[in-house]
Amino acid sequence: MTRFWCVNILRIATLYYIIAVALAMYLYPGGNHIELDQIGYSFHKNFLSELGFYKTMSGDINFLSSFFFNSAMYVLLLQGVAFLFIPKLFRDNRYSFAFSCIGTFFIIPACIFFVGVGLTPGDLYFEAHIFTTTTAFNLYTVAIFFYAIAFIFSPLSNYYASGSILLFIAVGVYAYYLAGFNPIDPINDRELFLSTYSMDFLIFNVLIQKIIITLMLLTIIIFTFGLDKLIKHQK
C-alpha cells in the first residue's frame, strides 16, 4: 500500500497528465492570444491553460480539449492524497520527517489550486484564473523547498535534494515573475492587450511556462525513485 500511494500513484498521475494534455493539444480547435485565425494548437504560442477555455480565442467551442485538460487537473488531486502518505517514509530522521510534513502541508493546497485552474477557465473567469494559477505555483514552490531539505537530512544521496533545489529556484523565479506581472485580459481588454504585448513576448511567456511545467513533472518522477529507495531502506 505504501509503494502504491508513494510511488505508483505519483507515476500514474504524472503519466496520465502528460497523455491527457497531449490529447487536449491535438483536439484544440485553434487561435491564440494574438492570432485569432490560428489553426490548431501551437506549442510555442498557446498557454497550457488555453486548453481549458470554454471557447478558444478563435471563438470555437472547446469541449473535447477542455475535457481532457480538466481531467488532467483533477488527477493532480491524487498526487495531493499521495503526499499524505509520504512523510512517514522520512520518519527515521526527525528533521526529514518535520520538513516533509511541512512540504505536504503546502503541496496539498497547491494541488487543489491547480484543480482550480481547470475550474476557472480564463475566457470566463480571468481574474479568478490568474489567482488560482499564481497561488498554485507559489504553494508548490514552498512545498518543493521543504521537501528538498527533507531529502538532505534523509539517508539518501543528495542527488534527489539537488534536483529539487534546482526546481525550487526555477519555480521560485517563475512565481516571482508572475507576482510582478500585470496580466491583461486578452478578450475583454483586447485593444490594450494587443497594444501592450508583442508576439515575441507571448512566445517567451508560453515557452517559460512549459519549461517550468516540464521540470515539475520530471521532479515528481525523480522523487518517486528516491521514495522507492526509502521504502526499501525501511524494510
Where are these regions (language model features)?
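Membrane-proximal helix-loop-helix units in multi-pass membrane proteins
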Residues: F106-L156
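N-terminal signal-anchor transmembrane alpha helix
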Residues: F4-H33
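Juxtamembrane "helix-exit" motif on the non-cytosolic side of transmembrane helices
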Residues: K88-R91, G116-L124, Y176-I184
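Terminal transmembrane helical module of multi-pass membrane proteins
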Residues: I144-K235
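Cytoplasmic juxtamembrane regions at transmembrane-helix boundaries
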Residues: L78-P109, Q234-K235
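Hydrophobic cores of alpha-helical transmembrane segments in multi-pass inner/ER membrane proteins
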Residues: T14-I18, A72-A82, N138-Y147, I211-G226
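Extracytosolic (periplasmic/ER-lumenal) interhelical loops and adjacent juxtamembrane/interface segments
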Residues: H33-I61
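Individual transmembrane alpha-helix segments
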Residues: K55-L89
